[in-house]
């Protein structure tokens, strides 16, 4: 793959990660005090990976909305570049669905796991499968749960252009969160994209896999889950924070 250098908005600084994990690099650099806007990235024929360092100015429970903002940013980017019939959905836990199949996911880490604390930094990571390995040897329907852009009619999308578009659209939504109506605007956009809303689901959390009906979210995008038996529970978005 011949790569052009991505061009990012002025508030973002790209960093080519080569074969290294951009999410790990972003978290390491954030811990060292790098400025917000650092965007390490890595591209191969089969995978796009990137991560964005943020410096929120609110407690962690509210700042986690950035995770959803970057998810909506990805859908907006794919929507602008992919064929019109392409369906993009976002799992609450970060998974990305393309025409119903898994094709990647979002990750999130922060300097603290205390919902009430003011985090020094938050990192949002993105992984997207561009092409399945040995896809030419796969029969149609052989991997129904897993897919890639190339398998869904999006193989002509320039991955560098997609990375640039994700950065631009995510920045729009991150800025929107700073406005008085930004959280409501993000919720309206996100609600139309979230996977299995109102349906029975299994939630793959780090320490458990609760089941129930996905009723909706609270003001901080925490999941409201109604089990078949017992009380309705709230699963905070901070539950998705990863150790790095």
Write out the residue ranges for each language-model feature.
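Short, exposed beta-strand/loop patches in secreted or surface proteins that constitute
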Residues: 40-41, 88, 214-216
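A glycine-rich, hydrophobic loop/mini-helix early in the fold
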Residues: 39-60
